[in-house]
Amino acid sequence: MIEFQNVHKTYRVAGKDIPALHPTSLRVENGQVFGLIGHSGAGKSTLLRLINRLENPSGGTIVVDDEDVTALDASGLRRFRQQVGMIFQHFNLLSSKTVADNVALPLTLAGELSRSDIDRRVAELLDRVGLADHAKKYPAQLSGGQKQRVGIARALATKPKILLCDEATSALDPQTTASVLQLLAEINRELNLTIVLITHEMDVIRRVCDQVAVMDAGVIVEQGPVADVFLHPKHPTTRRFVQEDEQIDENEQRDDFAHVPGRIVRLTFQGDSTYAPLLGTVARETGVDYSILAGRIDRIKDTPYGQLTLAITGGDMEAAFARFTAADVHMEVLR
């Protein structure tokens, strides 16, 4: 469990205090994949680097598995950091070392295992990330996705309890991003590893995260289960992320719908209701007609969801709206 208790961070720049993270409290349960999303300068990298004390907080308390990390001395901090792996946007591999030697580096520096034990652990890790036949290659011989897999293997070398991911997929193409996210999901599931990742891409959050915190200007403006936050956004920053992801311009959409007759509603379906024949049933029962103006079906981790924007005319509209609500479908009246 990772817990922030009123943690804040301020930098001193040219004689002025610049707040990077305002007083923040949050909790990440063991085994969760927790996402931090925000635009550049939102404070998400600062928050992530506070977890393993690459940055020291200006105030507040950070507790990991009932241990006050902010109170650790140098020796305790070295011990603690062996329990926390980290992967980076630009991989941070040593170009003069082979893949195997890059993965072995944390174990070599720790000095606790024999050479044969290190070799055995490295072989196991490379097999896990699908690079067993790349051990003797150098980083320059690898693709971006392969480099990040080496970074993941290296981060897992000391058998950490926590994995921190700093924009780990932002330098990768969409197909490679999907394969790396699938690997992270497998690692989380098989090792019960707690993962905290930061990103500016909603698709990353949707694919792998259980919980999400949305950040803006050093403040967590909204947090909760991914489906709750992104299917029913409350804060303007969250709504902007949703609109960017769906490529929606509210002003353009309002103009497009201006001459469409009837009431305009947006329905959000989750789980089994996503594929249920609800529209036809409601139309027959209440006598309404509907036109589909926009729609999508996607998944949040393993849960399907769908969104439809409808123009509804005729019949008993209030009965139709009540029927949608009774079917556990979230309805937003746009006009």
From Swiss-Prot:
Single Gene Ontology MF annotation: ABC-type D-methionine transporter activity
GO cellular component, one term: plasma membrane
Catalysed reaction equations from the record: L-methionine(out) + ATP + H2O = L-methionine(in) + ADP + phosphate + H(+); D-methionine(out) + ATP + H2O = D-methionine(in) + ADP + phosphate + H(+)
Superkingdom, natural source: Bacteria
EC id: 7.4.2.11
Stretches that traverse the bilayer: none
Family matches, as Gene3D superfamilies: 3.30.70.260, P-loop containing nucleotide triphosphate hydrolases
Entry keyword set: Amino-acid transport, ATP-binding, Cell inner membrane, Cell membrane, Membrane, Nucleotide-binding, Translocase, Transport
SUPFAM superfamilies named among the record's database cross-references: ACT-like, P-loop containing nucleoside triphosphate hydrolases
Disulphide-bridged cysteine pairs: none
InterPro entries membership: AAA+_ATPase, ABC_transporter-like_ATP-bd, ABC_transporter-like_CS, ACT-like_dom_sf, MetN_ABC, MetN_ABC_transporter-like, NIL_domain, P-loop_NTPase
Main subcellular location: membrane
Subcellular location: Cell inner membrane
Membrane topology field: Peripheral membrane protein
ABC transporter domain boundaries: 2-242
Binding locations of ATP: 38-45
Quaternary structure (record): The complex is composed of two ATP-binding proteins (MetN), two transmembrane proteins (MetI) and a solute-binding protein (MetQ).
Function in brief: Part of the ABC transporter complex MetNIQ involved in methionine import. Responsible for energy coupling to the transport system.
Family: Belongs to the ABC transporter superfamily. Methionine importer (TC 3.A.1.24) family.
Name of the protein in question: Methionine import ATP-binding protein MetN 1
Source organism of this protein record: Pseudomonas fluorescens (strain ATCC BAA-477 / NRRL B-23932 / Pf-5)
